[in-house]
Design a protein with these regions (language model features):
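Substrate-binding/catalytic subdomain of NAD(P)-dependent oxidoreductase enzymes
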Residues: 59-63, 68-86, 97-99
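Extended hydrophobic secondary-structure segments that form protein cores and membrane-embedded regions
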Residues: 1-5, 100-103
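Phosphate-binding loop/pocket of nucleotide- and phosphate-handling active sites
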Residues: 82-137
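Active-site/ligand-binding loops adjacent to catalytic centers
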Residues: 2-73, 117-137
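Short, active-site-adjacent cap segments at secondary-structure transitions
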Residues: 8-11, 80, 109
Length: 137
């Protein structure tokens, strides 16, 4: 089992309480987790790992999940995807292995982040030619 904490709020990875946790992933902006010991136990029993991901990696995964899967998750859920991407790039998965990420938080829990990291909508004329052009067909 693998777990991922935001770099600005990674007390388990760092091994100490983070007094002022900071991350865009508000649901995991925790400097002293109540289940710290349980998390360590789960990692040890599963021969897993807890690592950190940056806010930039979280945003990249957040956008990717929306664009490729049509899933509007919150940044804390995207942190798991960011972590798996990071691990895959580091060569920690063998070809053919499957990784599963649990994305339990809906994007509506953190709409301000969605607005902040989204591209500004295109303004076009109300005609088919412009619609086709903007959609890239």
């Amino acid at each position: 089992m693998f777990g991922f904490q935001a770099a600005g709020a990674a007390p388990i990875v760092l091994g100490h309480v983070v007094e002022k946790p900071k991350t865009i992933a508000t649901a995991i902006r925790i400097g002293n987790p109540a289940s710290w010991a349980h998390a360590i136990k789960a990692v040890q029993e599963s021969n897993g790992k807890i690592d950190l991901v940056t806010d930039e990696e979280i945003v990249e995964a957040y956008r990717m999940v929306a664009a490729l899967e049509g899933i509007f998750c919150e940044p804390a859920s995207a942190a798991s995807v960011a972590g798996v991407i990071k691990m895959q790039k580091a060569g920690l998965f063998k070809d053919g292995e499957t990784a599963v990420c649990t994305l339990t938080g809906h994007g509506l829990k953190d709409v301000d982040i969605a607005i902040a990291v989204s591209q500004k909508p295109a303004t076009i004329q109300a005609n088919m030619e412009d619609v086709v052009r903007v959609l890239g067909y």
